[in-house]
């Protein structure tokens, strides 16, 4: 893991037969490094795959200088067919800053609101303005100079960053449509044949984990690095 990494977050997507997760490292100026993209397969109605996910989230990652870091914050999507199980899993791990999220579309929806416990499990649930977050992810992907907000990805496929990953990461684009006589911006798939977009969503969730936890030491004094809006 590169020495510039100071803080690790994780984004987790829940599918019917697997979890997909990405560990992202963050440095000064919110420069980021893709650390690992992982698929964890199993029957989500049984406990083993949840235990496997917990093991993955408990992994420590070693930097080149020997320093070990653990995942300090994670956001897990509660959409799909297992919302109660996701919220319960996260509730039991809130002390590890593992949070359940629920996406809400719309360009005017704030990226993050304060969590609620208005659910059957009584666990914290963050409503995530996913379109706002996608704007931030895309803005960072467009940064071409290494430094603040730049995104690094490892060479080779050993860490899960294969051709399919980058197809998913870039599967969507922002378009403008007319609705009711006014312009409306929305995110759509570029190619209907490329329907998988989990990598884009998961990088969004890992970014949300960073913003919710708001760790010190990543900002550059006097420089505005904010690409997103956090609602109180």
Which residues does each PLM region occupy?
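C-terminal nuclease/phosphodiesterase catalytic domains that cleave nucleic-acid phosphodiester bonds
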Residues: 79-227
